[in-house]
Protein backbone atom coordinates (compact mmCIF):
# COMPACT_ATOMS: atom_id res chain seq x y z
CA UNK A 1 0.00 0.00 0.00
CA UNK A 2 1.25 3.51 -0.85
CA UNK A 3 0.70 5.87 2.08
CA UNK A 4 1.32 9.60 2.48
CA UNK A 5 1.60 11.00 6.00
CA UNK A 6 1.67 14.75 6.57
CA UNK A 7 1.89 16.92 9.67
CA UNK A 8 4.34 19.42 10.99
CA UNK A 9 5.49 22.64 12.52
CA UNK A 10 5.74 21.36 16.08
CA UNK A 11 6.46 18.07 17.82
CA UNK A 12 2.79 17.83 18.75
CA UNK A 13 1.97 17.16 15.11
CA UNK A 14 5.13 15.29 14.12
CA UNK A 15 5.46 12.60 16.80
CA UNK A 16 1.92 11.23 16.43
CA UNK A 17 2.69 10.94 12.70
CA UNK A 18 5.89 9.03 13.44
CA UNK A 19 4.00 6.73 15.83
CA UNK A 20 1.48 5.92 13.10
CA UNK A 21 4.27 5.29 10.58
CA UNK A 22 5.91 2.84 12.99
CA UNK A 23 2.60 0.97 13.40
CA UNK A 24 1.95 0.96 9.64
CA UNK A 25 5.42 -0.48 9.01
CA UNK A 26 4.91 -3.04 11.76
CA UNK A 27 1.61 -4.05 10.18
CA UNK A 28 3.16 -4.56 6.75
CA UNK A 29 6.85 -3.99 6.04
CA UNK A 30 6.00 -3.60 2.35
CA UNK A 31 3.93 -0.49 2.99
CA UNK A 32 5.56 2.35 1.06
CA UNK A 33 5.41 5.54 3.10
CA UNK A 34 6.12 9.14 2.11
CA UNK A 35 6.15 11.97 4.64
CA UNK A 36 5.17 15.40 3.30
CA UNK A 37 6.26 18.43 5.32
CA UNK A 38 7.85 21.84 4.89
CA UNK A 39 11.50 22.70 4.63
CA UNK A 40 11.29 25.20 7.50
CA UNK A 41 9.29 23.00 9.87
CA UNK A 42 10.78 20.88 12.65
CA UNK A 43 9.81 17.78 10.66
CA UNK A 44 12.57 18.47 8.09
CA UNK A 45 15.24 17.79 10.73
CA UNK A 46 13.47 14.89 12.49
CA UNK A 47 11.83 12.72 9.84
CA UNK A 48 14.72 12.06 7.37
CA UNK A 49 16.96 10.93 10.26
CA UNK A 50 14.48 8.11 10.91
CA UNK A 51 14.96 6.75 7.39
CA UNK A 52 11.50 7.88 6.25
CA UNK A 53 11.14 9.20 2.68
CA UNK A 54 10.49 12.93 2.91
CA UNK A 55 9.28 15.57 0.46
CA UNK A 56 8.47 19.23 1.03
CA UNK A 57 5.86 21.67 -0.21
CA UNK A 58 5.66 25.44 0.20
CA UNK A 59 2.98 26.60 2.63
CA UNK A 60 2.73 28.86 5.64
CA UNK A 61 0.02 29.81 8.10
CA UNK A 62 -2.41 32.42 6.82
CA UNK A 63 -2.73 35.39 9.22
CA UNK A 64 -6.19 35.72 10.81
CA UNK A 65 -6.07 39.48 10.15
CA UNK A 66 -5.09 40.90 6.78
CA UNK A 67 -1.57 42.31 6.89
CA UNK A 68 1.64 42.49 4.84
CA UNK A 69 2.15 38.71 5.13
CA UNK A 70 -1.32 37.76 3.88
CA UNK A 71 -0.42 38.00 0.17
CA UNK A 72 2.78 35.97 0.68
CA UNK A 73 0.84 33.31 2.59
CA UNK A 74 -1.82 33.04 -0.13
CA UNK A 75 0.83 32.87 -2.84
CA UNK A 76 2.60 30.03 -0.99
CA UNK A 77 -0.71 28.25 -0.40
CA UNK A 78 -1.43 28.12 -4.14
CA UNK A 79 2.15 27.02 -4.78
CA UNK A 80 1.75 24.32 -2.12
CA UNK A 81 -1.48 23.09 -3.70
CA UNK A 82 0.28 22.71 -7.07
CA UNK A 83 3.21 20.89 -5.43
CA UNK A 84 0.80 18.64 -3.51
CA UNK A 85 -0.96 17.77 -6.76
CA UNK A 86 2.36 16.83 -8.38
CA UNK A 87 3.34 14.59 -5.43
CA UNK A 88 -0.04 12.83 -5.52
CA UNK A 89 0.21 12.17 -9.26
CA UNK A 90 3.73 10.76 -8.94
CA UNK A 91 3.28 8.71 -5.73
CA UNK A 92 -0.32 7.52 -6.37
CA UNK A 93 -1.23 6.90 -2.69
CA UNK A 94 -3.93 4.50 -1.57
CA UNK A 95 -4.17 6.34 1.75
CA UNK A 96 -3.35 9.86 2.95
CA UNK A 97 -3.36 10.76 6.64
CA UNK A 98 -2.65 14.12 8.27
CA UNK A 99 -1.74 14.89 11.86
CA UNK A 100 -2.28 18.65 11.81
CA UNK A 101 -0.37 21.82 11.17
CA UNK A 102 -0.97 23.95 8.10
CA UNK A 103 1.35 21.75 5.98
CA UNK A 104 -1.24 18.96 5.96
CA UNK A 105 -3.92 21.21 4.42
CA UNK A 106 -2.85 21.24 0.74
CA UNK A 107 -1.90 17.56 0.52
CA UNK A 108 -5.06 16.28 2.26
CA UNK A 109 -7.39 18.62 0.38
CA UNK A 110 -5.92 17.67 -3.00
CA UNK A 111 -5.98 13.98 -2.00
CA UNK A 112 -9.77 14.15 -1.50
CA UNK A 113 -10.00 14.80 -5.26
CA UNK A 114 -8.25 11.49 -6.01
CA UNK A 115 -9.15 7.83 -5.44
CA UNK A 116 -7.12 7.74 -2.20
CA UNK A 117 -8.81 7.37 1.17
CA UNK A 118 -8.14 10.44 3.33
CA UNK A 119 -8.17 10.87 7.11
CA UNK A 120 -6.66 13.06 9.81
CA UNK A 121 -5.91 12.94 13.52
CA UNK A 122 -6.59 15.90 15.83
CA UNK A 123 -4.52 16.03 19.02
CA UNK A 124 -6.13 18.96 20.84
CA UNK A 125 -9.39 19.55 22.66
CA UNK A 126 -9.95 22.66 20.53
CA UNK A 127 -9.00 21.71 16.97
CA UNK A 128 -6.82 23.73 14.64
CA UNK A 129 -8.34 25.56 11.69
CA UNK A 130 -6.73 23.24 9.10
CA UNK A 131 -8.46 20.15 10.46
CA UNK A 132 -11.73 22.02 11.00
CA UNK A 133 -11.78 22.87 7.29
CA UNK A 134 -10.66 19.39 6.22
CA UNK A 135 -13.48 17.71 8.19
CA UNK A 136 -15.80 18.75 5.34
CA UNK A 137 -13.90 16.62 2.83
CA UNK A 138 -12.13 13.64 4.44
CA UNK A 139 -13.42 10.07 4.68
CA UNK A 140 -12.75 9.74 8.42
CA UNK A 141 -11.11 11.64 11.26
CA UNK A 142 -9.73 10.66 14.64
CA UNK A 143 -9.76 12.76 17.81
CA UNK A 144 -7.94 12.65 21.13
CA UNK A 145 -10.73 14.36 23.11
CA UNK A 146 -14.41 13.70 22.51
CA UNK A 147 -14.95 17.37 23.43
CA UNK A 148 -13.42 18.39 20.09
CA UNK A 149 -16.02 16.67 17.88
CA UNK A 150 -18.55 19.51 18.22
CA UNK A 151 -16.22 21.84 16.31
CA UNK A 152 -16.12 19.65 13.19
CA UNK A 153 -18.39 19.05 10.21
CA UNK A 154 -19.58 15.51 9.36
CA UNK A 155 -19.48 14.38 12.99
CA UNK A 156 -20.57 10.86 12.01
CA UNK A 157 -17.06 10.39 10.57
CA UNK A 158 -15.37 11.03 13.95
CA UNK A 159 -13.69 8.28 15.99
CA UNK A 160 -12.36 8.91 19.50
CA UNK A 161 -8.98 7.16 19.71
CA UNK A 162 -6.76 9.20 22.03
CA UNK A 163 -3.33 10.41 20.97
CA UNK A 164 -0.86 7.88 19.50
CA UNK A 165 2.44 7.88 21.40
CA UNK A 166 5.64 5.95 20.85
CA UNK A 167 6.26 2.81 22.92
CA UNK A 168 9.20 4.14 24.99
CA UNK A 169 6.98 4.43 28.10
CA UNK A 170 5.96 0.81 28.51
CA UNK A 171 7.10 -0.68 31.82
CA UNK A 172 9.00 2.39 33.08
CA UNK A 173 8.71 1.23 36.69
CA UNK A 174 11.63 -1.15 36.17
CA UNK A 175 13.83 1.95 35.79
CA UNK A 176 12.67 3.56 39.02
CA UNK A 177 15.45 2.36 41.31
CA UNK A 178 18.25 3.32 38.92
CA UNK A 179 16.53 6.64 38.20
CA UNK A 180 16.35 7.48 41.92
CA UNK A 181 20.09 6.81 42.13
CA UNK A 182 20.72 8.90 39.01
CA UNK A 183 18.87 11.88 40.48
CA UNK A 184 20.26 11.21 43.98
CA UNK A 185 16.78 11.09 45.52
CA UNK A 186 15.73 9.20 48.65
CA UNK A 187 13.20 6.37 48.22
CA UNK A 188 11.32 7.73 51.24
CA UNK A 189 10.39 11.05 49.66
CA UNK A 190 7.78 11.97 47.10
CA UNK A 191 9.06 13.52 43.87
CA UNK A 192 7.70 16.42 41.81
CA UNK A 193 8.89 16.74 38.21
CA UNK A 194 8.57 20.29 36.82
CA UNK A 195 9.13 21.01 33.13
CA UNK A 196 7.66 23.29 30.51
CA UNK A 197 7.99 21.26 27.35
CA UNK A 198 11.17 20.84 25.31
CA UNK A 199 12.16 24.51 25.58
CA UNK A 200 11.28 24.89 29.24
CA UNK A 201 9.04 27.57 30.72
CA UNK A 202 10.34 30.85 32.09
CA UNK A 203 7.21 31.31 34.20
CA UNK A 204 7.56 27.85 35.81
CA UNK A 205 11.27 28.48 36.38
CA UNK A 206 10.52 31.81 38.07
CA UNK A 207 7.85 30.30 40.33
CA UNK A 208 10.26 27.50 41.32
CA UNK A 209 13.09 29.97 41.91
CA UNK A 210 10.91 32.04 44.22
CA UNK A 211 9.89 29.04 46.33
CA UNK A 212 13.43 27.77 46.97
CA UNK A 213 13.26 28.72 50.65
CA UNK A 214 10.01 26.80 51.11
CA UNK A 215 11.39 23.81 49.20
CA UNK A 216 14.52 23.73 51.35
CA UNK A 217 12.60 24.03 54.63
CA UNK A 218 10.45 20.92 54.20
CA UNK A 219 11.28 17.21 54.01
CA UNK A 220 8.14 15.84 52.37
CA UNK A 221 9.22 16.01 48.73
CA UNK A 222 12.04 16.73 46.31
CA UNK A 223 11.80 18.49 42.96
CA UNK A 224 13.39 17.62 39.62
CA UNK A 225 13.33 20.73 37.41
CA UNK A 226 14.13 20.91 33.68
CA UNK A 227 14.66 24.60 32.96
CA UNK A 228 15.21 24.38 29.20
CA UNK A 229 18.71 24.72 27.78
CA UNK A 230 18.48 28.47 27.19
CA UNK A 231 17.28 29.20 30.73
CA UNK A 232 19.62 26.96 32.75
CA UNK A 233 22.62 29.28 33.25
CA UNK A 234 20.43 32.17 34.36
CA UNK A 235 18.55 29.94 36.82
CA UNK A 236 21.76 28.60 38.39
CA UNK A 237 23.22 32.11 38.54
CA UNK A 238 20.21 33.29 40.55
CA UNK A 239 19.70 30.20 42.68
CA UNK A 240 23.18 28.91 43.41
CA UNK A 241 24.24 25.35 42.62
CA UNK A 242 23.44 23.41 45.79
CA UNK A 243 19.81 23.66 46.90
CA UNK A 244 18.29 21.21 49.33
CA UNK A 245 15.49 19.12 47.77
CA UNK A 246 15.93 20.67 44.29
CA UNK A 247 17.68 18.97 41.35
CA UNK A 248 18.10 21.27 38.34
CA UNK A 249 18.85 20.19 34.76
CA UNK A 250 18.89 22.13 31.49
CA UNK A 251 17.13 19.33 29.62
CA UNK A 252 16.21 15.71 30.33
CA UNK A 253 16.74 13.34 27.41
CA UNK A 254 15.54 10.18 29.16
CA UNK A 255 12.22 11.65 30.28
CA UNK A 256 10.91 8.14 30.94
CA UNK A 257 13.25 7.98 33.96
CA UNK A 258 12.02 11.34 35.25
CA UNK A 259 8.45 10.08 34.91
CA UNK A 260 9.38 6.83 36.67
CA UNK A 261 10.54 8.57 39.86
CA UNK A 262 7.74 11.17 39.92
CA UNK A 263 4.58 11.16 42.00
CA UNK A 264 3.36 14.51 40.67
CA UNK A 265 4.07 16.33 37.39
CA UNK A 266 3.91 20.10 36.95
CA UNK A 267 3.93 21.02 33.28
CA UNK A 268 2.23 22.80 30.41
CA UNK A 269 -0.60 21.06 28.58
CA UNK A 270 0.59 20.15 25.11
CA UNK A 271 -1.20 17.17 23.58
CA UNK A 272 1.78 14.80 23.60
CA UNK A 273 2.61 15.50 27.24
CA UNK A 274 -0.99 14.84 28.27
CA UNK A 275 -1.05 11.58 26.32
CA UNK A 276 2.09 10.50 28.16
CA UNK A 277 0.71 11.50 31.58
CA UNK A 278 -2.53 9.61 31.04
CA UNK A 279 -0.74 6.56 29.61
CA UNK A 280 1.37 6.44 32.79
CA UNK A 281 -1.45 7.44 35.14
CA UNK A 282 0.42 10.42 36.59
CA UNK A 283 -1.20 13.07 38.78
CA UNK A 284 -0.51 16.57 37.50
CA UNK A 285 -0.73 20.30 37.96
CA UNK A 286 -1.19 21.79 34.51
CA UNK A 287 -0.08 25.32 33.64
CA UNK A 288 -1.31 25.88 30.08
CA UNK A 289 0.88 28.17 28.01
CA UNK A 290 -0.93 31.42 27.26
CA UNK A 291 -1.08 32.75 23.70
CA UNK A 292 -0.97 29.33 22.03
CA UNK A 293 -2.96 29.00 18.80
CA UNK A 294 -6.70 29.14 19.59
CA UNK A 295 -5.70 28.91 23.29
CA UNK A 296 -5.66 25.13 22.73
CA UNK A 297 -3.50 24.36 25.78
CA UNK A 298 -6.12 25.71 28.18
CA UNK A 299 -8.82 23.70 26.41
CA UNK A 300 -6.65 20.58 26.82
CA UNK A 301 -6.01 21.30 30.50
CA UNK A 302 -9.68 21.95 31.23
CA UNK A 303 -10.60 18.59 29.72
CA UNK A 304 -8.25 16.89 32.21
CA UNK A 305 -9.52 19.05 35.08
CA UNK A 306 -13.15 18.28 34.18
CA UNK A 307 -12.38 14.56 34.45
CA UNK A 308 -10.64 14.93 37.82
CA UNK A 309 -7.23 14.07 36.35
CA UNK A 310 -5.38 17.28 37.20
CA UNK A 311 -5.40 20.66 38.89
CA UNK A 312 -5.05 23.72 36.66
CA UNK A 313 -3.27 27.01 37.34
CA UNK A 314 -3.34 29.63 34.60
CA UNK A 315 -0.09 31.47 33.89
CA UNK A 316 -1.61 34.76 35.06
CA UNK A 317 -2.35 33.17 38.45
CA UNK A 318 0.95 31.32 38.82
CA UNK A 319 3.45 32.41 41.44
CA UNK A 320 5.58 30.72 44.09
CA UNK A 321 2.72 30.70 46.62
CA UNK A 322 0.01 29.27 44.35
CA UNK A 323 2.36 26.60 43.03
CA UNK A 324 3.83 25.55 46.38
CA UNK A 325 0.41 25.48 48.07
CA UNK A 326 -1.05 23.32 45.29
CA UNK A 327 1.90 20.90 45.37
CA UNK A 328 1.71 20.70 49.15
CA UNK A 329 -2.05 20.13 49.14
CA UNK A 330 -1.81 17.20 46.72
CA UNK A 331 1.21 15.54 48.32
CA UNK A 332 -0.27 15.91 51.82
CA UNK A 333 -3.37 13.96 50.82
CA UNK A 334 -2.68 10.45 49.51
CA UNK A 335 -6.36 10.01 48.63
CA UNK A 336 -6.27 13.10 46.41
CA UNK A 337 -2.97 12.04 44.83
CA UNK A 338 -4.33 8.56 44.08
CA UNK A 339 -7.60 9.98 42.76
CA UNK A 340 -5.80 12.28 40.32
CA UNK A 341 -3.58 9.41 39.23
CA UNK A 342 -6.48 6.99 38.70
CA UNK A 343 -8.54 9.55 36.77
CA UNK A 344 -5.52 10.37 34.62
CA UNK A 345 -5.18 6.68 33.74
CA UNK A 346 -8.87 6.56 32.80
CA UNK A 347 -8.21 9.19 30.13
CA UNK A 348 -5.57 7.01 28.52
CA UNK A 349 -5.99 5.24 25.20
CA UNK A 350 -3.06 2.78 25.36
CA UNK A 351 -3.99 1.21 22.02
CA UNK A 352 -4.52 4.53 20.18
CA UNK A 353 -1.93 3.78 17.50
CA UNK A 354 -3.25 0.30 16.79
CA UNK A 355 -6.87 1.49 16.81
CA UNK A 356 -6.20 4.25 14.29
CA UNK A 357 -4.32 1.92 11.93
CA UNK A 358 -7.11 -0.69 12.26
CA UNK A 359 -9.62 1.96 11.18
CA UNK A 360 -7.40 3.07 8.30
CA UNK A 361 -7.11 -0.49 7.01
CA UNK A 362 -10.88 -0.94 7.25
CA UNK A 363 -11.34 2.28 5.30
CA UNK A 364 -9.12 1.10 2.44
CA UNK A 365 -10.57 -2.44 2.46
CA UNK A 366 -14.15 -1.10 2.25
CA UNK A 367 -13.20 0.72 -0.92
CA UNK A 368 -11.55 -2.39 -2.38
CA UNK A 369 -14.66 -4.50 -1.69
CA UNK A 370 -16.87 -1.88 -3.28
UniProtKB/Swiss-Prot annotation:
* Catalytically driven reaction(s): di-trans,octa-cis-undecaprenyl diphospho-N-acetyl-alpha-D-muramoyl-L-alanyl-D-glutamyl-meso-2,6-diaminopimeloyl-D-alanyl-D-alanine + UDP-N-acetyl-alpha-D-glucosamine = di-trans,octa-cis-undecaprenyl diphospho-[N-acetyl-alpha-D-glucosaminyl-(1->4)]-N-acetyl-alpha-D-muramoyl-L-alanyl-D-glutamyl-meso-2,6-diaminopimeloyl-D-alanyl-D-alanine + UDP + H(+)
Q: Gene3D superfamilies of this UniProt entry? A: Glycogen Phosphorylase B (3.40.50.2000)
**What Pfam families does this protein's entry cite?**
Glyco_tran_28_C, Glyco_transf_28
Q: What class of enzyme is it?
A: transferase
Membrane topology summary? Peripheral membrane protein
Instruction: Give the EC number(s) under which this enzyme is classified.
Output: 2.4.1.227
Which cellular component terms (GO) are annotated to the entry? plasma membrane
PANTHER family noted in UniProt: GLYCOSYLTRANSFERASE, UDP-N-ACETYLGLUCOSAMINE--N-ACETYLMURAMYL-(PENTAPEPTIDE) PYROPHOSPHORYL-UNDECAPRENOL N-ACETYLGLUCOSAMINE TRANSFERASE 1
Point out the gene that encodes the protein.
murG
Subcellular location field: Cell membrane
Query: Could you confirm whether the keyword Cell cycle appears in this record?
Result: yes
Give the protein's function. Cell wall formation. Catalyzes the transfer of a GlcNAc subunit on undecaprenyl-pyrophosphoryl-MurNAc-pentapeptide (lipid intermediate I) to form undecaprenyl-pyrophosphoryl-MurNAc-(pentapeptide)GlcNAc (lipid intermediate II).
Which residues are recorded as binding UDP-N-acetyl-alpha-D-glucosamine?
A: 10-12, 124, 166, 198, 252, 297
* GO terms for biological process, alphabetical: carbohydrate metabolic process; cell division; cell wall organization; lipid glycosylation; peptidoglycan biosynthetic process; regulation of cell shape
- Give the record's keywords alphabetically: Cell cycle, Cell division, Cell membrane, Cell shape, Cell wall biogenesis/degradation, Glycosyltransferase, Membrane, Peptidoglycan synthesis, Transferase
Q: Which organism is it from?
A: Finegoldia magna (strain ATCC 29328 / DSM 20472 / WAL 2508)
* A Gene Ontology molecular function term of the record: UDP-N-acetyl-D-glucosamine:N-acetylmuramoyl-L-alanyl-D-glutamyl-meso-2,6-diaminopimelyl-D-alanyl-D-alanine-diphosphoundecaprenol 4-beta-N-acetylglucosaminlytransferase activity
Record's protein name = UDP-N-acetylglucosamine--N-acetylmuramyl-(pentapeptide) pyrophosphoryl-undecaprenol N-acetylglucosamine transferase
Which domain of life, per UniProt? Answer: Bacteria
Q: What is its main location?
A: membrane
Q: In which pathway does it act?
A: Cell wall biogenesis; peptidoglycan biosynthesis
Amino acid sequence: MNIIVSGGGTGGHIYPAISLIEELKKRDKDNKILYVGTEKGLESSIVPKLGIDFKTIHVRGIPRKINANSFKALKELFQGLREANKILKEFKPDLVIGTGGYVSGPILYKATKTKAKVAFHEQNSFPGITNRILSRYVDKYFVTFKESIKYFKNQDKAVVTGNPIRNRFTDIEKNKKSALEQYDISENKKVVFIFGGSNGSEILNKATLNMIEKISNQDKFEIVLATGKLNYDEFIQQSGKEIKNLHVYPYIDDIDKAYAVSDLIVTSSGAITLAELSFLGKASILVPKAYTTENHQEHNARAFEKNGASKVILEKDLNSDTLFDQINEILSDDNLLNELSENSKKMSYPTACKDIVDELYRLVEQDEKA
